[in-house]
Design a protein with these regions (language model features):
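Type-3 copper protein
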Residues: 1-169, 262-560, 759-780
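Acidic, low-complexity/disordered tracts enriched in E/D and polar residues
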Residues: 130-235
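Accessory beta->alpha helical hairpin/"wing" motif in late/C-terminal subdomains of nucleic-acid enzymes
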Residues: 178-214, 269, 277-303, 625-626
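Hydrophobic residues embedded in beta-strands of well-ordered beta-sheets
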Residues: 215, 284, 615-619
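Short amphipathic beta-strand/extended segments with alternating polar/hydrophobic composition
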Residues: 218-227, 420, 424-433, 626-635
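Short capping segments at the starts of secondary-structure elements
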Residues: 234-244, 248, 254-255, 406
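C-terminal structured domains
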Residues: 508-779
């Protein structure tokens, strides 16, 4: 059953959301609040996928010890057994509920899988789809719905490594929300109805600067304004509707009440034709979308229109209530379908979008949940990884500084070129170099981040030292490499306070909580997100006491940021997920059309001046505040640095690298896709034999995480499973067809399923991950 949307349990003290606890023997501090992420289904579910007879039969055949008939028999037996398990799985109520939330198209094939018969090729395809969903739900620690509930944890407050208490259920609290694009579509429909736009907010474009009684456009052209135009624009803040603007002009600026409404309408339409103004629902791309729409409707002064639109909001709320009350997958699908039908009937738009894209917010609603547990990560745990984690954090500081330095060098050159084109005495603005600056991060040519990554790889190679060919494990101690690491990763002060927070994702290799507390465990550094506070998760703001998580980060760091106001179509900019959450004190860089409901917080790029003195560029905003280039571009640098920072050895086969009790890098293979040597035409049994031979030749584990070039994240593949080997073979063929030089990245599954320590109240164990934040100090 979907849990009701309730207030989150106070499991942590939010006053501890700051760097509080020293990593022993270093000047790094761990923040006092972390996040436990986990799978929503027990890890034991992985045992439902896989072959028992075919792998051995394939090995015997490859060694010349078995026959094709023996393999054929074993393979068909495994296919039938796995198909039977998948058919039974298709009836599992909890799995059906998870899939109903995520993909109703897949949900609708589950009954046909559970029933016998049907066309074999279609049935096998559906089995592959279900198997891939199941492995994801059992093997990946996520933060989405009840199939990935998170839990806030206390960090460093207790001595024992891990203390955990469970409630009776997996999920303690849930919240269902409309996707931002859903809200925007409803709001746009409202604003487009006859006579409605008057009750919605006009806003001066983010990339246009109002300077007295003239506008400065992004291309530096100026538009002289009539006095009344300037007065209207100063009030067009993206939140006031035209009626509210009119009232202020009458009350504060002496406009004649009799003709003010017509005059304001005339001004707004004139500015709209000049394309310096937006006049629509203006729903920002963040988790406040529903709140903003409610505010829009509440401000409508036309009684008939207000009642009509208020009824729409009430109907949306009713549909959300039905979704929350759904007690089964079938009831959930019925409720979701009803919401879809209402949305289509109301807006005339499709009820889904961006099919197949990750982080896109494809359907109308989403649900976030909290796990029903309370957990403390104690000092014994932190002390065990303090020295190696501090060494990695030193490397992250170096990487952030080096990336910022490379970006600054490029931007200085851009500013100088722009200055040479200007008339004497004319300052360069950020708008003059903004397109080229963005290209430094996401353009087609050689980016600064690519150079920084290459240099980082060389530095890790120098620190780790020579690794013999064929080695599968490299075990190092901090004492062995600390002098080299301090020299190699030496760097100055971090160039911006907002590049000074690093976020490790840790996985614990242990069979139980008792094993962890007894010191019988290993810790894996899954990733370290450099220069980024990854606990800044807007979709969990509802769980975090008062205020947003971004506000808490800014308070702890002691400063606000300049955040680029990204347009709606920007990658991963869906509302629930955003590249750069915006805090209450942050100011925004306006560089294109983009919705936001507080125009006074936007700094148009054309109004930010860039001046050079003694080789240093200083950015000055309209309030007179100055910033270095790294401070100006800190958010962009952070977005890129967080995924670019890597540890390990760039070689076809890289061994597992362990530093004291912290695994820095899992054993990894980067293999040419053509090396699988599949025949051009698919054949299930032949493909299985070919893949099993490839696994054996490269000494790969039977279960491994696999990533193809076009994929965002790796997926678990069981190379004993007839179902998943067939999927893998299809992906290999597709990759080779797209790029003959494509490589497949394979990494060991660490922790192994039996080493998943996180239990529930029933004793089942779950894949999990601990997300922490560390910083050297609170920057001044």
């Amino acid at each position: 059953m979907t849990a009701p949307a309730v207030e989150a349990a106070r499991a942590v003290d939010w006053a501890d959301f700051a760097p509080l606890h020293p990593l022993a023997g270093s000047d790094w501090q761990v923040w006092g609040v972390g996040l436990l992420r986990n799978a929503g289904f027990p890890v034991s579910g992985l045992d439902l996928i896989g072959g028992t007879s075919a792998p051995a039969a394939a090995a015997r055949l490859a060694a010349g010890e078995g026959t094709a008939e023996e393999f054929d028999t074993a393979y068909r037996a495994d296919v039938d057994a796995e198909a039977a398990r998948l058919a039974a799985l298709a009836t599992d109520p909890k799995l059906r509920l998870a899939i109903a939330w995520q993909n109703r198209t897949v949900f609708r094939i589950l009954d046909s899988l559970a029933a016998p018969g049907g066309k074999e090729t279609k049935r096998r395809q559906r089995e592959r789809t279900l198997a891939m969903y199941w492995l994801r739900y059992c093997a990946k620690a996520e933060t989405i719905g009840f199939f990935g509930p998170g839990a806030w944890i206390g960090v460093g407050r207790t001595q024992e490594a891990i203390g955990i208490d469970h409630g009776p259920a997996l999920v303690a609290a849930a919240r269902t929300s409309l996707e931002r694009w859903t809200v925007a579509a409803i709001a746009d429909w409202m604003a487009e109805q006859p006579g409605a736009r008057w009750w919605f907010p006009p806003m001066l474009r983010p990339d246009v600067h109002l300077d007295g009684e003239q506008l400065v456009l992004a291309n530096r052209k100026t538009v002289r304004l009539r006095p009344e135009d300037a007065q209207v624009l100063r009030l067009a803040d993206g939140d006031r509707n035209a009626e509210q603007i009119t009232d202020l002009l009458i009350a504060d600026h002496g406009w004649d009440a009799a003709g003010a409404r017509g005059a304001v309408d005339k001004v707004l339409n004139r500015l709209l034709r000049q394309r310096v103004l937006g006049w629509d629902a203006n729903i920002p791309v963040d988790v406040r979308a529903e709140e903003v729409l409610r505010r829009r409707v509440s401000a409508i002064g036309d009684p008939e229109m207000f009642v009509r639109y208020d009824a729409v909001l009430a109907e949306l709320a009713r549909h959300k209530g039905e979704i929350d009350r759904a007690g089964s997958a079938e009831q959930l699908v019925e409720a979701l379908d009803a919401l879809d039908a209402y949305f289509v009937e109301t807006t005339g738009q499709a009820a889904s979008r961006e099919e197949g894209k990750a982080y896109a917010g494809r359907t109308l609603v989403y649900q976030d949940t909290l796990r029903d547990c309370r957990m403390e990560l104690g000092r014994d745990f932190l002390d065990g990884i303090a020295r190696p984690l501090a060494l990695v954090a030193d490397a992250a500081d170096w990487f952030g500084n080096r990336l910022a330095e490379l970006v600054e060098t490029e931007v200085v050159a851009l500013v100088r070129k722009a200055a040479a084109r200007q008339r004497p005495g004319t300052a360069v603005t950020l708008a003059d170099v903004w397109p080229q600056t963005l290209a430094l991060f996401w353009g087609e040519h050689n980016h600064p981040v690519q150079q920084a990554v290459r240099e980082l790889a060389l530095k890790w190679r120098e620190v780790i030292g020579e690794v013999p060919d064929g080695a599968t494990r490299v075990d190092l101690s901090v004492d062995q490499i600390i002098d080299s690491a301090k020299k190699v990763f030496a760097t100055g002060e971090v160039r911006s306070p907002h590049l000074a927070v690093h976020s490790p994702d840790l996985q614990v290799v242990a069979r139980s909580v008792d094993a962890v507390n007894g010191g019988q465990h290993l810790v894996v550094l899954g990733e370290l997100h450099a220069c980024l506070a990854t606990l800044d998760l807007p979709f969990l703001d509802w769980t975090a006491d008062t205020g947003s998580l971004r506000d808490k980060v800014n308070r702890a760091i002691g400063g606000e940021r300049l955040v680029p106001l990204l347009p709606v179509g920007w990658k991963r900019n869906s509302g629930r997920m955003v590249p750069a959450p915006i805090g209450a004190g942050d100011r925004l860089i306006g560089f294109t059309r983009a919705p936001f409901d507080q125009r006074e917080r936007i700094e148009p790029a054309v109004a930010i001046t860039l001046t050079e003195h003694d080789g240093t560029i200083t950015a000055t905003t309209t309030d007179g505040r100055t910033r270095t280039l790294s401070e100006l571009l800190a958010v962009l640098i952070s977005i890129i640095a967080c995924d670019a920072f890597k540890i390990g050895l760039d070689r076809p086969h890289a061994p597992r690298v362990t530093l004291d009790d912290l695994v820095l890098f899992r054993e990894t293979w980067r293999l040419p896709a053509t090396g699988v040597a599949l025949a051009p035409k698919a054949d299930r049994m032949r493909d299985y034999l070919t893949v099993r031979r490839w696994v054996a030749d490269n000494a790969l584990p039977d279960r491994a995480f696999v990533k193809f070039p076009e994929e965002t994240k790796p997926s678990l593949v069981d190379f004993t499973s007839p179902t998943l080997v067939l999927s893998f073979a299809n992906l290999v063929r597709r990759a080779v067809q797209s790029d003959p030089d494509a490589r497949v990245t394979v990494s060991e599954p660490l922790p192994a399923p039996e080493e998943s320590w996180l239990p529930d109240a029933d004793g089942e164990q779950y894949v999990s991950e601990l997300r922490l934040q560390i910083s050297r100090k609170v920057p001044e």
